[in-house]
Amino acid sequence: MRTLWQHCHVATMADGRYSAIEDAAIVTSAGLIEWIGPRAELAPVEADRTVDLGGAWVTPGLIDCHTHAVFGGNRSGEFEQRLQGVSYAEIAAQGGGIASTVRATRAASEDELFASAHQRVQALMRDGVTTLEIKSGYGLDLANERKMLRVARRLADELPLTVRATCLAAHALPPEYAGRADDYIAHICDEMLPALAGEGLVDAVDAFCEHLAFSPAQVERLFIKARELGLPVKLHAEQLSSLHGSSLAARYQALSADHLEFMTEEDAVAMASAGTVAVLLPGAFYFLRETQLPPMDALRRHGVKIALASDLNPGTSPGLSLRLMLNMGCTCFRMTPEEALAGVTVHAATALGLGDSHGSLQVGKVADFVAWQIERPADLAYWLGGDLPKRVVRMGHEISN
């Protein structure tokens, strides 16, 4: 079906800029953008349907390129403890922290995980999200990582959005491998990844490169295996310290390196050369009350593409609003509203390996877009909360009005 969408203004986000078109029209057909431009330049078109957008601003559908949306349990009690002065180490010694989420996730059935994740993902969708990534990483064994990734696939099947599933088995050391990190990495490489990839459950491979998680050498073993399996890689890097994990990610042409508060100029140069996207996660920065800022000037100076994401997870960023992350990116990291919007559209698409099909409003790309009740694109980063989406369109079909 061919649809003409008109009486709107468009921020195409081509090349990471607003690239605004006033009084625009969009023609969609077969799920793709067939034509876009000033309405005055549109030749007569035979449309099956014409939609008047009432002067709304239209942007690409938002893309949340880093989430841990599938998990069991709830850690709000730990939030209260931390506000009362209990340290993370003390909470962990009590059996809390990521270990508590692993226990709850392992104990939950696939249907239970699906039901809770479904609610969280729907909250993101109400904010204009049409594409998101979901990581595993709270199962930490084959059966439970499979369970999490199956939930991600089910969400893609049952909700009108695009989901990319990332295997993050190298998120933390499971209790049964305490003190044996090398053995656990070998288990992931020899058994878990081949099995999960063989079942078609994995779109990318991620790891957590930190002193409290896995070393660069261990991560590299994982990357080598991912490359053998034909899977792209991503990396949690430089969140708490500088191990040059982002440079390691760049050497393996990673789609992205994420967090990056402690990255160096050398890391930025490597990422720029490899085309690796810097995914910044202001929700975790805010929630943990961190003080070390990502090196924004170095990222800009070397032309590294910058994305933003919610990092939705139960321990460090229980954020259900990607639009809130736009504001946090501006207020916490000194991004411009234009940079922030590019960070959840065109650059987020690149961070998921979808840059050729998603993330900007251009002829031939997927017709995912949002019509917003705003006066200008900067409003998306300006307003805190509120119901701003007027219509959400995925593959040329309205999913919200």
Curated annotation (Swiss-Prot):
Keyword Hydrolase carried by entry: yes
Residues reported to bind Fe(3+): 66, 68, 236, 311
Pfam families: Amidohydro_1
Ligand binding (4-imidazolone-5-propanoate): 75, 138, 171, 239, 316
GO biological process: L-histidine catabolic process to glutamate and formamide; L-histidine catabolic process to glutamate and formate
Subcellular location: Cytoplasm
Binding site for N-formimidoyl-L-glutamate: 138, 313, 315
Protein name: Imidazolonepropionase
Annotated source species: Pseudomonas putida (strain ATCC 47054 / DSM 6125 / CFBP 8728 / NCIMB 11950 / KT2440)
Origin organism lineage: Bacteria, Pseudomonadati, Pseudomonadota, Gammaproteobacteria, Pseudomonadales
Protein's gene: hutI
